[in-house]
Amino acid sequence: MHIWVDADACPAVIKDILFRAAQRWQIPLTLVANQMLRTPPSALIRAVQVPRGFDVADAHIATHAVAGDLVITADIPLAADVLAKGALALNPRGERYSPDTIRERLSLRDMMEELRASGVDTGGPAAFSQADRKAFANQLDALLARQAAQASRP
């Protein structure tokens, strides 16, 4: 397993949780962004800076993620792409994307985009909360524990 992070919009507190998880579980972690990122000194953790542009970081992750990897993203089309490859996808609020729910999420996203394009103020996401941080940490820990248990089976 490799953890890929769509890091441009990922909250710093989530990155910190991921840094600790990579060390604890000894799993490689790559943050992908169109800007320089600070990472702790670790052979497991690296940052990739991609050129600025629409969905360039997403395209990098979609190209490099493979079945069994974990992708952290709030971008629903990216989540759909990596799920189609057999990877896992989790958003920074702790919601796991699944093949069963991704079509509905894409449809809702497209509808909201159409409303915004027609001038309707749809508001934005709620502020990132302590409950979101906790939900992410719990979901991440459960996913990594499950992965470790599967890897240790003969």
Swiss-Prot record:
Belongs to the UPF0178 family. Coiled coil: none annotated. It comes from the Bacteria. CDD domains: PIN_YqxD-like. It comes from Bordetella avium (strain 197N). InterPro entries: UPF0178. This is UPF0178 protein BAV3236.
